[in-house]
A protein has these predicted regions:
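Non-catalytic signal-transmission and effector/linker regions of two-component phosphorelay proteins
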Residues: 1-14
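Active-site residues of response regulator receiver
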Residues: 17, 61, 89
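The feature encodes the CheY-like receiver
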Residues: 23, 65, 93
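Charged docking surfaces used in two-component/phosphorelay signaling
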Residues: 24-32
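Acidic catalytic/metal-coordinating carboxylates
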Residues: 41-45, 68-71
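Short amphipathic alpha-helix used as the core "switch/output" element in two-component signaling
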Residues: 48, 70-81, 99
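Active-site beta3 strand of CheY-like receiver
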Residues: 53-59
Length: 119
């Protein structure tokens, strides 16, 4: 299970999801815990933003139009080795979780995400 409690209190979290309402909700939740949050609505947008400003953690949707969350994770690891990535999905299956874990993602969460799963 992922936990943000190991991050320093003012850590920067990069949130990536193609669902605008989820981006807004998760951003508010994370900011209320003291984290700095940046967002992107696509994996490609996230990579562009990460090139400008690094994050302490990336929290990304698995299934997005264009590049998916696992491909984003692989690109992040090739450019910023060791940056932790948590993959989240509304349609999580055991094979998805196994693939994500074998790829080396920090954690895999199924939406809706319970506040206790993160903090």
């Amino acid at each position: 299970m992922a936990s943000l409690s190991t991050l320093h209190p003012d850590a920067k979290i990069f949130l990536v999801d193609d669902d605008a309402s989820l981006l807004k909700l998760m951003s508010m939740r994370l900011r209320s815990q003291g984290y700095e949050v940046d967002t992107a609505d696509s994996a490609e947008g996230a990579l562009d933003r990460l090139r400008q400003q690094r994050a302490d953690l990336v929290l990304s949707d698995l299934r997005m139009g264009g590049m998916d969350g696992l491909a984003l994770f692989e690109r992040i690891q090739s450019q910023w080795l060791g940056m932790p990535v948590i993959i989240m999905t509304a349609h999580g299956t055991i094979p998805d979780a196994i693939q994500a874990t074998r790829s080396g993602v920090f954690s895999f969460l199924t939406k809706p995400i319970n506040k206790d799963e993160l903090f």
